[in-house]
């Protein structure tokens, strides 16, 4: 792995500090920076660029590199271990004074309350050092990806913790906390605790560990990842006042349709500069060549690519929008034009760099169409549009465009696990439930069963994994809307079983699955130990729930890096889960989920219709944010060379 520094010369005079305006809504500016030309508006850009260059004392070496390479990255590199240092002739090597790293200062649990005013140290400012990370091998990428996963896990856990703390203060039926407000609070707390990624550098190009197609639900989450450094501005850039040569450089943009003159064509984007809008999102005055607008022009001049994140309206249980990382684009042209409202705006033509994975926004739109009109985008390959035959709340598609195999149609679909006869009769006398008419809350019997905390938030998201979750059952007085009734409501997201060259059969979702979201039950015919031994001797392959591994999710809900006095809750041990499931004749969609030691789905044991600790239901939850059309995977707790999916499906 290497990093290359942008050639910035500290001897050059910096320009005044340029503060980015909020996007898409900004305050109106009182003074115009220019008068709209009567003839060619594009001449304004040439004039502004010319004046900027004349006022800047460039060295001859720097001019030579800039004009010949059209790039801010030097072509000659000296290799020192894993760091690529630019040729000193370009003026790129800038001595940086070593400042001692500030110590992390975790909050106390009481600091999460808005009623507690705590004086916090001023967070460390972002670095002004621009680098590009190169030569990331598979193992390094895996480590970066794991670091991203853990950081996102802390962010999601903290955001939900803050939401639940406010809900406790407001009581059952009280005012709910604003999701975006707590998202910002969680981001700020992680910044104060030095948990933001890549804050010690500004990365140009790809962020190691962040993949094209990754989905985020809040702008602050983009900041935590280092993908986009400003929670409100649509253009993230290094300001001229921080740049050693006085030139701002853009590193990423958010395309959210906030400007009326934007034109998004997928691989090509006509991006409107920032500024000049009123509170209603209408262009109310001319834009100026400053801040992010100037940074975009400078990145175009030097050939520096920018990361593009698209913000899309997408109703879900977490927020009303999603942000999708769509990869790297180059700014190939810029001009000044008259916008739809008659005011001058800067426009930039962005073209996607070839050779990248398919854009996540395109996949998202494709999956939306599959849910409503699948044959319009996939005229061949669909075998059945509901293999559950109406037993699930939503249809389960079956798709195969590889061969003529239709095996999933030959099994009886089982929406829930079938337990041994008499189990429910034996347990009915021991049934006990809550009397929460409006839904479970503090002091509830079901809360006590779950070690003093309900396992889900008010959106039905799993707060943290437990050995066993007791959901409300038939003996409880709470309504179906109770937040302690999640898995018993059944399948809610659209799933598709598909033929795969790698795994035989696989499962993917047509919906966005956020971390902690319930997916479905893993259903089959439950067998006692004695029954399982007999079938095993006959050569039948069984599924053993106790073998499922969810070790990668054990840290979910651990906030010890943010809250100094946080104590991880302890839960009572449960008897070993000692039953098997036969799926040779009856099964559901979950049985086609592939095996992986790096899964994106976890197993959670749940009870709701009986009290036998020996026979919990096997429920599946998303272990991370899963984009549409991404294959789901489970860790079946078997060795890597073992046949995928326990040889169930092939």
Curated annotation (Swiss-Prot):
<comment type="subunit">
    <text>Component of an RNA-directed DNA methylation (RdDM) complex that contains at least MORC6, MORC1/CRT1, MORC2, SWI3D and SUVH9. Interacts directly with MORC6, MORC2 and MORC1/CRT1. Interacts with SWI3B, SWI3C and SWI3D.</text>
</comment>
<dbReference type="Pfam" id="PF05033">
    <property type="entry name" value="Pre-SET"/>
</dbReference>
<keyword id="KW-0862">Zinc</keyword>
<dbReference type="InterPro" id="IPR007728">
    <property type="entry name" value="Pre-SET_dom"/>
</dbReference>
<dbReference type="GO" id="GO:0008270">
    <property type="term" value="F:zinc ion binding"/>
</dbReference>
<feature type="binding site">
    <location>
        <position position="434"/>
    </location>
    <ligand>
        <name>Zn(2+) 2</name>
    </ligand>
</feature>
<feature type="binding site">
    <location>
        <position position="444"/>
    </location>
    <ligand>
        <name>Zn(2+) 1</name>
    </ligand>
</feature>
<feature type="binding site">
    <location>
        <position position="476"/>
    </location>
    <ligand>
        <name>Zn(2+) 2</name>
    </ligand>
</feature>
<feature type="domain" description="SET">
    <location>
        <begin position="493"/>
        <end position="637"/>
    </location>
</feature>
<feature type="binding site">
    <location>
        <position position="482"/>
    </location>
    <ligand>
        <name>Zn(2+) 3</name>
    </ligand>
</feature>
<dbReference type="InterPro" id="IPR001214">
    <property type="entry name" value="SET_dom"/>
</dbReference>
<comment type="similarity">
    <text>Belongs to the class V-like SAM-binding methyltransferase superfamily. Histone-lysine methyltransferase family. Suvar3-9 subfamily.</text>
</comment>
<feature type="binding site">
    <location>
        <position position="440"/>
    </location>
    <ligand>
        <name>Zn(2+) 3</name>
    </ligand>
</feature>
<dbReference type="Pfam" id="PF00856">
    <property type="entry name" value="SET"/>
</dbReference>
<dbReference type="GO" id="GO:0003677">
    <property type="term" value="F:DNA binding"/>
</dbReference>
<feature type="domain" description="YDG">
    <location>
        <begin position="205"/>
        <end position="352"/>
    </location>
</feature>
<dbReference type="GO" id="GO:0005634">
    <property type="term" value="C:nucleus"/>
</dbReference>
<feature type="compositionally biased region" description="Low complexity">
    <location>
        <begin position="7"/>
        <end position="20"/>
    </location>
</feature>
<keyword id="KW-0539">Nucleus</keyword>
<feature type="binding site">
    <location>
        <position position="472"/>
    </location>
    <ligand>
        <name>Zn(2+) 2</name>
    </ligand>
</feature>
<feature type="region of interest" description="Disordered">
    <location>
        <begin position="95"/>
        <end position="129"/>
    </location>
</feature>
<dbReference type="InterPro" id="IPR003105">
    <property type="entry name" value="SRA_YDG"/>
</dbReference>
<feature type="region of interest" description="Disordered">
    <location>
        <begin position="1"/>
        <end position="24"/>
    </location>
</feature>
<dbReference type="GO" id="GO:0009294">
    <property type="term" value="P:DNA-mediated transformation"/>
</dbReference>
<dbReference type="GO" id="GO:0080188">
    <property type="term" value="P:gene silencing by siRNA-directed DNA methylation"/>
</dbReference>
<dbReference type="InterPro" id="IPR015947">
    <property type="entry name" value="PUA-like_sf"/>
</dbReference>
<dbReference type="GO" id="GO:0000775">
    <property type="term" value="C:chromosome, centromeric region"/>
</dbReference>
<dbReference type="InterPro" id="IPR036987">
    <property type="entry name" value="SRA-YDG_sf"/>
</dbReference>
<keyword id="KW-0479">Metal-binding</keyword>
<keyword id="KW-0158">Chromosome</keyword>
<feature type="binding site">
    <location>
        <position position="478"/>
    </location>
    <ligand>
        <name>Zn(2+) 3</name>
    </ligand>
</feature>
<protein>
    <recommendedName>
        <fullName>Histone-lysine N-methyltransferase family member SUVH9</fullName>
    </recommendedName>
</protein>
<dbReference type="InterPro" id="IPR051357">
    <property type="entry name" value="H3K9_HMTase_SUVAR3-9"/>
</dbReference>
<dbReference type="InterPro" id="IPR046341">
    <property type="entry name" value="SET_dom_sf"/>
</dbReference>
<feature type="binding site">
    <location>
        <position position="446"/>
    </location>
    <ligand>
        <name>Zn(2+) 2</name>
    </ligand>
</feature>
<feature type="binding site">
    <location>
        <position position="472"/>
    </location>
    <ligand>
        <name>Zn(2+) 3</name>
    </ligand>
</feature>
<feature type="binding site">
    <location>
        <position position="434"/>
    </location>
    <ligand>
        <name>Zn(2+) 1</name>
    </ligand>
</feature>
<dbReference type="InterPro" id="IPR025794">
    <property type="entry name" value="H3-K9-MeTrfase_plant"/>
</dbReference>
<keyword id="KW-0137">Centromere</keyword>
<dbReference type="GO" id="GO:0042054">
    <property type="term" value="F:histone methyltransferase activity"/>
</dbReference>
<keyword id="KW-0238">DNA-binding</keyword>
<dbReference type="Pfam" id="PF02182">
    <property type="entry name" value="SAD_SRA"/>
</dbReference>
């Amino acid at each position: 792995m290497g990093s290359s520094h942008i050639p910035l010369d500290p001897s050059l005079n910096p320009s005044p500090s340029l503060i980015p305006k909020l996007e898409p809504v900004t305050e109106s500016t009182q003074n115009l920076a220019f008068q709209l030309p009567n003839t060619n508006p594009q001449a304004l850009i040439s004039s502004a660029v010319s004046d900027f260059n004349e006022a800047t004392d460039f060295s001859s070496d720097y001019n030579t590199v800039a004009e010949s390479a059209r790039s801010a990255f030097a072509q000659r590199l000296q290799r020192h271990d894993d760091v690529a240092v630019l040729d000193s002739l370009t003026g790129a090597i800038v001595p940086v004074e070593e400042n001692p790293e500030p110590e992390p200062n975790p909050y106390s649990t009481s600091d999460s309350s808005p009623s507690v005013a705590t004086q916090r140290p001023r967070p460390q400012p972002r670095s002004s050092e621009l680098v590009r990370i190169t030569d990331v091998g598979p193992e390094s990428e895996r480590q970066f990806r794991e670091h991203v996963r853990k950081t996102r896990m802390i962010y999601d856990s903290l955001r939900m913790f803050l939401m639940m703390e406010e809900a406790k203060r407001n009581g059952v039926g009280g005012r709910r906390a604003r999701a975006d407000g707590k998202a910002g609070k969680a981001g700020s707390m992680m910044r104060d605790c030095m948990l933001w990624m890549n804050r010690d550098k500004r990365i140009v190009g790809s962020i190691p560990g962040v993949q094209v197609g990754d989905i985020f639900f809040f702008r602050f989450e983009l900041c935590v990842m280092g993908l986009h450094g400003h929670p409100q501005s649509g253009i993230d850039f290094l300001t001229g006042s921080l740049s050693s040569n006085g030139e701002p450089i853009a590193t990423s943009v958010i395309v959210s349709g906030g400007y009326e003159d934007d034109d998004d064509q997928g691989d090509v984007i006509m991006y409107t500069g920032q500024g000049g809008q009123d509170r209603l999102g209408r262009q109310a005055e001319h834009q100026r060549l400053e801040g992010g607008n100037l940074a975009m022009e400078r990145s175009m001049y030097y050939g520096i690519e920018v990361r593009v994140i698209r913000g899309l309206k997408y109703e879900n249980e977490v927020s009303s929008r999603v942000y999708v990382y769509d990869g790297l684009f180059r700014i190939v042209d810029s001009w000044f034009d008259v916008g739809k409202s008659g005011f001058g705006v800067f426009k930039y033509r962005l073209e996607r760099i070839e050779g990248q994975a398919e854009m996540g926004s395109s996949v998202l739109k494709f999956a939306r169409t599959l849910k409503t009109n699948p044959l319009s985008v996939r005229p061949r390959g669909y075998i059945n549009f509901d293999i559950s035959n109406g037993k699930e709340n939503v249809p389960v598609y079956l798709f195969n465009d590889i061969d003529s195999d239709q095996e999933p149609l030959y099994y009886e679909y089982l929406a829930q696990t079938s337990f041994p006869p008499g189990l429910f009769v034996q347990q009915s006398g021991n049934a006990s439930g809550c009397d929460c008419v409006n839904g479970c809350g503090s002091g509830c019997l079901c809360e006590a069963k779950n070690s003093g905390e309900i396992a889900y938030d008010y959106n039905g998201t799993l707060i943290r994994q437990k050995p066993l979750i007791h959901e409300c059952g038939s003996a409880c007085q709470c309504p179906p809307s109770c937040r302690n009734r999640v898995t018993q409501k059944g399948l809610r997201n659209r799933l598709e079983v598909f033929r795969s060259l790698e795994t035989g059969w696989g499962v993917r979702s047509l919906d966005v699955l956020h971390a902690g979201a319930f997916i479905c039950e893993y259903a089959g015919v439950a067998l006692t130990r004695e029954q399982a031994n007999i079938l095993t001797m006959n050569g039948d392959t069984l599924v053993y729930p106790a073998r499922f591994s969810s070790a990668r999710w054990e840290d979910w809900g651990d906030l010890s890096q943010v809250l100094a006095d946080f104590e991880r809750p302890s839960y009572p041990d449960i008897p070993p889960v000692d039953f098997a499931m036969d799926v040779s004749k009856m099964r559901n969609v979950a049985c086609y989920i592939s095996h992986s030691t790096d899964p994106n789905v976890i197993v959670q044991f749940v009870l709701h219709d009986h009290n036998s600790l020996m026979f919990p239901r096997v429920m599946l939850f998303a272990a991370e944010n899963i984009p549409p059309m991404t294959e789901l995977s489970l860790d079946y707790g078997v060795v890597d060379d073992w046949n995928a999916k326990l040889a169930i499906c092939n």
